[in-house]
């Protein structure tokens, strides 16, 4: 089990279509939502039987900002005009469960494959003065949200340099249409772990999560392009 801090560098773009397809809204550049964040992250793995295991992961991230627009932003059939002050925010929660089977195990390495599920919750909002056909509709808040279980396949490889040092890698992938969602998902991690004591160790890894999805819901017709990446510093406990 690992617990620690995920230092994210995030890039968030969303699209909210109206009567015609809209353009991507860059929440980092256009809405000034910060690209850097730190959040708690937890990981566990339990081996049952000689070759089978189940693993899990959880982290979330949220941020909001206020900014003066430097260019127009389109939201459905509405426009927020350059020079106006707006508030904006995004949030993402990721929960992962993965069932795997090891296919090649040696004294210093292990390779396995499996399948799992990502439960994702994503939301974004913008508040300000909205215009349609150059006429103000007043100040208000508009928001979109989506949550869905997305299946994936994946694999992992571990290699122990010595009794105390180990390199671990894993990758999950999805490229499929599920219900109202179609697109791709990547969730990858590469880590170096040091076993400081018998049951306690330290870890430093690079975490990469990317989701590029088109959404066709009654309350959100559009899409999202999300990338969260950065180091994960952890305390590892094993028994």
Across the structure, where does each feature detected by a protein language model lie?
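Extracellular/periplasm-exposed beta-strand and loop segments of Gram-negative cell-envelope proteins
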Residues: 11-38, 60-93, 120-148, 176-181, ...
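Residues on the lipid-exposed face of transmembrane beta-strands in outer-membrane beta-barrel proteins
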Residues: 3, 42-46, 97-101, 115-117, ...
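Transmembrane beta-strand segments that form the barrel wall of outer-membrane beta-barrel proteins
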Residues: 166-179, 183
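Ordered, amphipathic secondary-structure segments that act as subunit-interaction surfaces
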Residues: 92-98, 105, 110
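Transmembrane beta-barrel strands of outer-membrane/channel proteins
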Residues: 3-7, 56-60, 113-119, 157, ...
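Repeated loop/turn-to-beta-strand initiation elements of outer-membrane beta-barrel proteins
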Residues: 51-54, 109, 163-167, 198-202
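A contiguous binding-surface segment within folded domains or other stable secondary-structure elements
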Residues: 150-171
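Transmembrane beta-barrel domains of bacterial outer-membrane proteins
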Residues: 1-17, 27-62, 98, 182-190
């Amino acid at each position: 089990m690992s617990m620690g801090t995920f230092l994210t560098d995030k890039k968030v773009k969303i699209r909210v279509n109206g009567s015609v397809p809209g353009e991507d809204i860059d929440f980092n550049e256009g809405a000034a939502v910060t690209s850097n964040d730190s959040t708690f992250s937890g990981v566990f793995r339990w081996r049952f039987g000689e070759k089978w295991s189940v693993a899990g992961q959880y982290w979330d991230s949220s941020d909001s900002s206020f900014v003066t627009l430097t260019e127009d932003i389109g939201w459905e059939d509405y426009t927020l005009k350059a020079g106006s002050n707006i508030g904006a925010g995004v949030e993402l929660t990721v929960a992962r469960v993965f069932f795997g089977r090891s296919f090649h195990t040696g004294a210093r390495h292990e390779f396995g494959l499996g399948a799992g599920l990502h439960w994702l919750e994503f939301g974004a909002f913008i508040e300000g003065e909205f215009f349609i056909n150059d006429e103000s509709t007043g100040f208000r808040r508009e928001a979109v949200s989506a949550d869905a279980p997305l299946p994936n396949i994946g694999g992992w490889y571990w290699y122990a340099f010595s009794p105390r040092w180990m390199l671990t890698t894993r990758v999950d992938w999805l490229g499929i249409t599920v219900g109202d969602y179609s697109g791709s998902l990547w969730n990858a991690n590469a880590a170096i772990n040091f076993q400081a004591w018998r049951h306690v160790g330290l870890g430093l890894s690079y975490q990469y999560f990317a989701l590029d999805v088109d959404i066709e819901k009654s309350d959100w017709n559009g899409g999202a392009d999300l990338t969260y990446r950065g180091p994960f510093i952890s305390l590892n406990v094993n028994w």
